[in-house]
Amino acid sequence: MANKTVLFNKHLESDAKMVDFHGWDMPLNYGSQIEEHHAVRQDAGMFDVSHMTVVDVNGTDACAFLRKLLANDVAKLKVPGKALYGGMLDHNAGVIDDLITYYLNDTHYRIVVNSATREKDLAWIAQEVKGFDVVITERPELAMIAVQGPNAKAKAASVFNTAQNAAVEGMKPFFGVQADSLFIATTGYTGETGYEIIVPDSEAEALWLALLEAGVKPCGLGARDTLRLEAGMNLYGLDMDESVNPLAANMGWTIAWEPADRNFNGREALAAIKAAGTEKMVGLIMEAKGVIRPGMSVFFSDSDGVEQQGTITSGTFSPTLGYSIAMARVPRSIADTAEVEMRKKRVPVKVIAPSFVRNGKQAF
């Protein structure tokens, strides 16, 4: 039996096409993936992300534990509610998961991890926490709704109560605040402004219906994927996993090398990889007809004229740009043009930084 989120019946009421997503019955779309994509880029859309795993980390050693567990450094978080994105690495510097950490106070942090990696993540955390004065608490009674788009905050404001609107007023990106029963964060997975709202299961249906009434369009996994790829955001399992180090997954900016004495998991292995050199992640755009798909090969000649090869990790048709975009892991010697092999033919592509659309506009 697949898991169902607390909003399952609401999806059916909106005529969602349901699919299995890592053991969860989730909406793929509600009729038109393209319309849902454009709603988020131009207005406001919402996603049921209750399959994500919310974990609270409490105790006097919470900070010390997370400084060992994560490659980014939670000691940088000084203001309550501030959030941090980063990787949880194994001892070989492979990416176990990518996640967001919220600093609530010195003895309380909240992490949100991917659903597909839940059991693996919790087992790793349980193993690594030994010896620390920390209590790990999964919060399965909490649902999560992401409201994203240029009008998302205004439409959410019409649903929030006075205290909640006061709590989020002027809140910068990558913050979270507990406001009555809602934990409201200025985070997202679309490249647009908006909120990710953690809500008790018992209140999730009412919040979903209120947002629907406020004109927020329900959006499924299909639009979520095209939006995150346009924004150049990684999808765990496609763009990285334990076989990939963060430097080869456009996550170098999330590695806190300083202070030098912070011995985070995988540090030694990652330092050796960095010194030896590793592949990198690039963005590709293809204005010719066709769609670049994961697993396709990328070819280019390096400065010595030697042919090099890389692999597409994520690829799709970009509804915003009107042509195909992709992310690829390639040797570092790549320049600004390459070719992708499609149906035994090589098609030219442009090579850019892996970010295509932000806040509704072309980002390159």
Curated annotation (Swiss-Prot):
The UniProt keywords, alphabetically, are: Aminotransferase, Transferase
**Enzyme class, first EC level, given as a word:** transferase
Q: Which SUPFAM superfamilies match?
A: Aminomethyltransferase beta-barrel domain, Folate-binding domain
GO MF annotations for this entry?
aminomethyltransferase activity; transaminase activity
GO CC annotation, single: glycine cleavage complex
Q: Which Pfam families match?
A: GCV_T, GCV_T_C
Record's catalysed reaction(s):
N(6)-[(R)-S(8)-aminomethyldihydrolipoyl]-L-lysyl-[protein] + (6S)-5,6,7,8-tetrahydrofolate = N(6)-[(R)-dihydrolipoyl]-L-lysyl-[protein] + (6R)-5,10-methylene-5,6,7,8-tetrahydrofolate + NH4(+)
* Gene Ontology terms describing biological process: glycine decarboxylation via glycine cleavage system
What does the UniProt function comment say about this protein?
Answer: The glycine cleavage system catalyzes the degradation of glycine.
Q: Which HAMAP family match?
A: GcvT (MF_00259)
Check the record and name the PANTHER family matching this protein.
AMINOMETHYLTRANSFERASE, AMINOMETHYLTRANSFERASE, MITOCHONDRIAL
Matching NCBIfam families, A to Z?
gcvT, PRK00389.1
**Under which name does UniProt file this protein?**
Aminomethyltransferase
Instruction: Record the organism.
Output: Shewanella woodyi (strain ATCC 51908 / MS32)
Q: Which gene encodes it?
A: gcvT
